A protein has these predicted regions:
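Short, Lys/Arg-rich, polar N-terminal cytosolic tail immediately upstream
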Residues: 1-11
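Hydrophobic transmembrane alpha-helices and their membrane-interface boundaries in multi-pass
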Residues: 16-92, 99-105, 123-125
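Alpha-helical transmembrane segments and their interfaces in multipass membrane proteins
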Residues: 30-54, 109, 113-172
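Short, charged/polar micro-motifs that form catalytic or ligand-binding hotspots
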Residues: 92-93, 115
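Residue-level hotspots within the lipid-embedded alpha helices of multi-pass solute transporters
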Residues: 93-94, 153
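Alpha-helix N-cap/helix-start motif
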Residues: 95-97, 118
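Long, heptad-repeat coiled-coil alpha-helices that serve as cytosolic signaling/dimerization stalks
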Residues: 177-183
Length: 183
């Protein structure tokens, strides 16, 4: 698997952009919970999950502040997102499965194929577990939607790997051209 080695400055910029992307996702999670409370009535667990999403924003901010120039910051944000994403998915309907895609696309800025593949596979597994739970509950409409998301996850894994590989190749070609011009 391919990965591009980023400089500290590149990690700093990429981690800051990823913080912005994840903050938007977490705020969207809060919106999902609030709309469910409005639609279905008060739910203590919805408020607990909203608290978790706000805590995730704050924790992601701390991660970026402390580890902005390091790969560890990227990994910490990715792990946190997967955990919070799982809480969202298992606490809500099948439609929330699509929230894996903005993060997967965002994490492509790190040009790290293993990061993308691992994140995609974990979201794929979360989708499968959600489908199993929907099937047991007899929710065929949501099960059908979740099945489409699973297929979309598979396509995302494949396509994002291809895109990251090509972007790394482009980067290496550009570096070779710059080095050749410098000589």
């Amino acid at each position: 698997m391919k990965r591009q080695v980023l400089t500290q400055q590149q990690y700093k910029r990429a981690n800051r952009v990823m913080f912005f992307i994840l903050t938007i996702c977490y705020l969207f999670f809060v919106g999902i919970e609030i709309s469910n409370v409005v639609k279905h009535g008060q739910s203590t667990m919805a408020y607990v999950r909203c608290g978790l999403y706000v805590a995730a924003i704050l924790l992601t901010g701390v991660i970026v502040k402390l580890l902005a120039e390091k790969k560890a910051g990227t990994i910490a944000m990715a792990v946190l997102y997967i955990v919070v994403y799982a809480v969202l998915v298992f606490g809500n309907g099948a439609g929330t499965l699509v929230m894996a895609f903005p993060a997967i696309i965002g994490f492509m800025i790190f040009l790290n194929e293993p990061l993308i593949v691992i994140g995609s596979v974990i979201s794929f597994l979360i989708s499968i577990v959600k489908c199993i739970l929907l099937n047991r509950a007899g929710d065929s409409l949501s099960l059908g939607f979740a099945s489409v998301v699973i297929l979309g996850s598979f396509v995302t894994i494949w396509c994002s790997r291809m895109a990251v590989r090509l972007l790394i190749d482009f980067s290496q070609e550009n570096q070779a051209e710059i080095q050749k011009a410098a000589e």
